[in-house]
Amino acid sequence: MGASRLAPTVCFVAPHQEDTVLRSTEVVIIGAGAAGLMCALTAAGRGRQVLLLDHANKAGKKILMSGGGRCNFTNMYTEPANFLSQNPHFCKSALARYTQWDFIGLVAKHGVPYHEKKLGQLFCDNKSSDILGMLLDECDQVGVELRLDTSIQTIEKVESGYLLDTTLGQVQCQSLVIATGGLSIPTLGATGFGYQVAKQFGHELLPTRAGLVPFTITDQLKDCLLYTS
């Protein structure tokens, strides 16, 4: 039986019993967070057939809690000179392809009200759900198929691309994007899946460490600091 091509429609549904046959698509993106949604709408906007998968029951959970619930979605001073990196050339090429002004234009297109808080930080006037809704609307307009509550069991490199065993059944694709994020906030669904896939395909893994943590001090140290200020 040949693999059937699905019509590019958005489906915000859990997998069904009949989804057990081999299906084919051009692009599979694993992870429906900010990166996965942007990747999906960009690829589909260029005419690719895109299937976006996530093991959670909702897309963009971290978007909803970001910025204290108002989503600090970009910074007006997002420039290569303001980044620290072992490979500054990557930053230059990435920001040249898509700038903060491109995203601000997308926000304006959808009529999302926002303001500058300080030092170029841009926040929604209302709620983070405005940004999530914007990304989902963009995905809808270009025909991204979103499937939630979908787990990936195995990934295999094949001649035509990649073969995935999922709770949807087998999925074959030409291009595969892993956009599952890091390990932070496991209560929102973060796992080490992306690291496992990277290791499976022979990529070098660097030790992870926290990038944003609370700073706490003891009462005794606080009293000492009062006399040094």
Predicted feature residues:
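Short, low-complexity intrinsically disordered segments enriched in A/P/G/S/L with frequent Arg
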Residues: 7-8, 14
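N-terminal Rossmann-like FAD-binding beta1-loop-alpha1 element of flavoenzymes
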Residues: 27-51
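Residue-level detector of alpha-helix initiation sites
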Residues: 29, 33-34, 58, 182-184
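Redox-cofactor binding/interface segments in oxidoreductases and associated redox assembly factors
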Residues: 30, 65, 178-179
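Glycine-rich FAD pyrophosphate-binding loop
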Residues: 45-63
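Glycine-rich active-site loop/strand segments that organize a redox cofactor
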Residues: 70-115
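Feature captures the FAD/FMN-dependent oxidoreductase FAD-binding
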Residues: 99-175
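Predominantly flavin-linked oxidoreductase catalytic cores and closely associated redox partners
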Residues: 142-229
